[in-house]
C-alpha cells in the first residue's frame, strides 16, 4: 500500500471521455504525483465532485 504523501499535497484534475465514439461521457480524474508521477487518486462524474475531492486531498485538516 502506498504511503501517505507529505503536506503540502498537490493534485490536479484531468478531464477524460469514456465510452464509444459518439456516445462518450465526460469523467473527471483527480491525479497527483505521489507515489508515482501522474497517479490516479479518484474518478468523479462531475467537475464539482472532483473539485471537492481535490480540496479534501490537499487540506491537512482533513487527515
Curated annotation (Swiss-Prot):
Annotated region Disordered: the residues are 35-63
Q: Cross-referenced Gene3D superfamilies, in alphabetical order?
A: YaiA protein (3.30.730.30)
InterPro entries for this protein: YaiA (IPR032303), YaiA-like_sf (IPR038462)
Q: Where are the transmembrane segments?
A: none
Q: Where is the composition biased (Basic and acidic residues)?
A: 51-63
- What is the name of this protein? Uncharacterized protein YaiA
Amino acid at each position: 500500500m502506498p504511503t501517505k504523501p507529505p503536506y503540502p499535497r498537490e493534485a490536479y484534475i484531468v478531464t477524460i471521455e469514456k465510452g464509444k465514439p459518439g456516445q462518450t461521457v465526460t469523467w473527471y480524474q483527480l491525479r497527483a504525483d505521489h507515489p508515482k508521477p501522474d497517479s490516479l487518486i479518484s474518478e468523479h462524474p462531475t467537475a464539482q465532485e472532483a473539485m471537492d475531492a481535490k480540496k479534501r486531498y490537499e487540506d491537512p485538516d482533513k487527515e
